[in-house]
Amino acid sequence: MKEVNDYFVPWLKGEKMYLSSHIELAWENKSLHRLMSNENPLPPSRKVLDAISRYGKIANRYPEQGKDVRKKIAVINKLDGMGNVLIGNGSSEVFDMIWRSFLQPGDEVIQHTPCFGIYKLRCKALGGKLVSVPMIYRDNQLLFDADGIIKAISPKTKIIVVANPNNPTGNFMDGKDFVKIAETGLPFVVDEAYVEYAGLAKSQVALVNKYKNVMITRTLSKAYGLAGMRFGYMLANEQVIAQIAAMLIPWNVGTIAMWAALAALEDVKALEERVKFNNEAITYYENELKDVPGLVVFHSYGNYILLDGHGAGKKGDDMIAFALKRGLILRPQEPIYGNDGFFRLTIGSKKENQMAVKAIKDFFKS
């Protein structure tokens, strides 16, 4: 007689639930400073908190399909209407819906590396194969390689995904390279989780009107500071949206989350304040750390900074351990290019940023 384990799909057997150990650590030790998960250090605006309070009172009712917030998103992005917008329980769910819509077991997803880990997780959960194209590390810069992505295409390729700006490197890919990839006709996902920090002029959303295969994903977890509310969205051709929407779990976005999202999108002043705070902090880090011998600080258009201490003979993991002793959680980075000197930090409060700068300087003096 078979056991229940015999019925699991083969690519799921032995796999474990994704666990963000650094987030678990932060919740278990609330005195630690969270400079590791690209969260916004500023709390939601008063208008958002008012919306949460107001709509929390009708949390006993099922939500509708987010018509108001989808219309607002379409207006912001100069698209025809809410038919060009799909909303999800964070952009992680949006990726899951896209992957489910295009992938069968054995199909391939092409990504750049280093990059956001969710692409691999959702690909693996569906029995797909991830094909990684390394960025080019040259002259202390990590550069996109669009030609490398195109060369990696095979008959099994079903999705190409590029984060713009990239996480964790913080840089943008050239516009002409997006066109080059879009011209392949393959489903092309552009992850713009952090684009608000540089402004929507850097978005590739205009490609949606020209290329039916281009899909833009965004989140309100970063510049808008709603990571705990779980709200993300996709922008694409209306027919593509309609087909992917068939994968939606009914009522996938709760009432409180969608109205909090709408309040955040309408509160332009609050967004501007958060972007200004973040970008000034990026400049602060760059100015403070530029003269640390052997340390490479990659310029970032996000709310995080990638650093490389290899030139000083320092290991990223040792920096993480050193910072933790001072109450700071920074983010480790797996070795790339045979280099174990990389680590990453998230922009924090003014005090936290000062603490992080001091910790980094002290570590590199040791």
Where are these predicted regions, by residue range?
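N-terminal "arm"/small-domain region of PLP-dependent enzymes with the aminotransferase-like
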Residues: 1-61, 72
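PLP-dependent aminotransferase class I/II
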Residues: 45, 213-291, 296-298
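Short loop-beta-helix segment that forms the pyridoxal 5′-phosphate
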Residues: 63, 74-97
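Conserved PLP-anchoring active-site segment centered on the Schiff-base-forming lysine
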Residues: 101-122
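Active-site phosphate-binding strand-loop segment of PLP-dependent enzymes
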Residues: 131, 136-196
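Conserved PLP-binding catalytic core of the aspartate aminotransferase-like
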Residues: 279, 292-326, 343, 347
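PLP-dependent enzyme catalytic core of the Aspartate aminotransferase-like
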Residues: 322-326, 335-366
